[in-house]
Amino acid sequence: MPAVLSSVLSNITDFVVHEGNGVKGLADMGLEALPKQYVQPEEERITTSTVIVDDTIPVIDLSEWGSDPKVGDMICEAAEKWGFFQIVNHGVPLEVLEEVKAATYRFFRLPAEEKNKHCKDNSPSNNVRYGTSFTPHAEKALEWKDFLSLFYVSDEEAAALWPSACRDEALTFMRNCDAVIKRLLKSLMKGLNVTEIDGTKESLLMGSKRINMNYYPKCPNPELTVGVGRHSDVSTLTILLQDQIGGLYVRKLDSDTWVHVPPINGAIVINVGDALQILSNGRYKSIEHRVIANGSNNRISVPIFVNPRPNDIIGPLPELLESGEKAVYKNVLYSDYVKHFFRKAHDGKETVDFAKIN
């Protein structure tokens, strides 16, 4: 083993986390075996015995959205029964999707010292964060992923703080998804018999947004680790663009089995987040999902997390309780909910249970 690699492996946390090399830096050194810090417990690895190969999440064609009410019904049904679905003919130009994927690769190919300007200790703002794994300080085993997280406040702040390697493409992707997000939420609210989205509800449903750029390098011994561990998102909705490599798995509702989300060129993956599960009083389901590591290819994904504002109180919508439903969830300050999520390692649906009424 070369001396440099031996030194890195003896100080992986410094190399990967503190020096900004990320797991990409490890992979670029030509590792032949997975470092022990990334070996996941067996119960956290996905196996062929738990995967259903002949099933997958719904794919919904939005081309007739304006004229066919069945499209809205399909969206609501998918949110109830799966919590995940793919959309095609959504109106976001293919070139916008391809450009943001190219920009993601461009950022992660920057030198470590350039990326490290945006790490937790160096970034001029908490709204811009480059990092690795999920919460390295709280994890027993690290996840095989690097990320750039960009919390959107304004175009002016983005121009000043977001990395120039990907800033314009990320903003363009977000802007192009806005109309789709609003229509999806309108359909989902209609399914709850909520006919008016006033300013308060708009804040609860889409008051803030965060876009992540995720990079999963090819991995030695991918069967021993994970790209992302089991979790549900804390968002209202997540709008996910994935590349053609694949590797995203979704847990079937009320089951211990998983299904693959196959890449479809031009499609966008939509999933219900915890906030919408709580707002809908459990009608719409945020579902556990995970990403496996890949031994042959690098993989990227670009999710937009559509969230309440940090100072919003989330709880079952008044219209549902006024119709006689019993509240399943308590009212929670959204920023407290998010802090609870990020203080620990990925742990399935534990965070949404935090908001349940016992």
Swiss-Prot record:
<feature type="binding site">
    <location>
        <position position="301"/>
    </location>
    <ligand>
        <name>2-oxoglutarate</name>
    </ligand>
</feature>
<dbReference type="GO" id="GO:0009699">
    <property type="term" value="P:phenylpropanoid biosynthetic process"/>
</dbReference>
<comment type="similarity">
    <text>Belongs to the iron/ascorbate-dependent oxidoreductase family.</text>
</comment>
<dbReference type="GO" id="GO:0002238">
    <property type="term" value="P:response to molecule of fungal origin"/>
</dbReference>
<feature type="binding site">
    <location>
        <position position="299"/>
    </location>
    <ligand>
        <name>2-oxoglutarate</name>
    </ligand>
</feature>
<keyword id="KW-0479">Metal-binding</keyword>
<feature type="binding site">
    <location>
        <position position="231"/>
    </location>
    <ligand>
        <name>Fe cation</name>
    </ligand>
</feature>
<dbReference type="InterPro" id="IPR044861">
    <property type="entry name" value="IPNS-like_FE2OG_OXY"/>
</dbReference>
<comment type="function">
    <text>2-oxoglutarate (OG)- and Fe(II)-dependent dioxygenase (2OGD) involved in scopoletin biosynthesis. Converts feruloyl CoA into 6'-hydroxyferuloyl CoA, and, at low efficiency, caffeoyl-CoA into 6'-hydroxycaffeate, but has no activity with p-coumaroyl-CoA.</text>
</comment>
<dbReference type="InterPro" id="IPR026992">
    <property type="entry name" value="DIOX_N"/>
</dbReference>
<dbReference type="GO" id="GO:0009620">
    <property type="term" value="P:response to fungus"/>
</dbReference>
<dbReference type="GO" id="GO:0046872">
    <property type="term" value="F:metal ion binding"/>
</dbReference>
<keyword id="KW-0560">Oxidoreductase</keyword>
<comment type="pathway">
    <text>Phenylpropanoid metabolism.</text>
</comment>
<keyword id="KW-0408">Iron</keyword>
<dbReference type="GO" id="GO:0016706">
    <property type="term" value="F:2-oxoglutarate-dependent dioxygenase activity"/>
</dbReference>
<dbReference type="Pfam" id="PF03171">
    <property type="entry name" value="2OG-FeII_Oxy"/>
</dbReference>
<keyword id="KW-0223">Dioxygenase</keyword>
<dbReference type="InterPro" id="IPR027443">
    <property type="entry name" value="IPNS-like_sf"/>
</dbReference>
<dbReference type="GO" id="GO:0009805">
    <property type="term" value="P:coumarin biosynthetic process"/>
</dbReference>
<dbReference type="InterPro" id="IPR050295">
    <property type="entry name" value="Plant_2OG-oxidoreductases"/>
</dbReference>
<feature type="domain" description="Fe2OG dioxygenase">
    <location>
        <begin position="200"/>
        <end position="308"/>
    </location>
</feature>
<protein>
    <recommendedName>
        <fullName>Feruloyl CoA ortho-hydroxylase F6H1-2</fullName>
        <ecNumber>1.14.11.61</ecNumber>
    </recommendedName>
</protein>
<feature type="binding site">
    <location>
        <position position="233"/>
    </location>
    <ligand>
        <name>Fe cation</name>
    </ligand>
</feature>
<dbReference type="Pfam" id="PF14226">
    <property type="entry name" value="DIOX_N"/>
</dbReference>
<dbReference type="InterPro" id="IPR005123">
    <property type="entry name" value="Oxoglu/Fe-dep_dioxygenase_dom"/>
</dbReference>
<feature type="binding site">
    <location>
        <position position="289"/>
    </location>
    <ligand>
        <name>Fe cation</name>
    </ligand>
</feature>
<feature type="binding site">
    <location>
        <position position="216"/>
    </location>
    <ligand>
        <name>2-oxoglutarate</name>
    </ligand>
</feature>
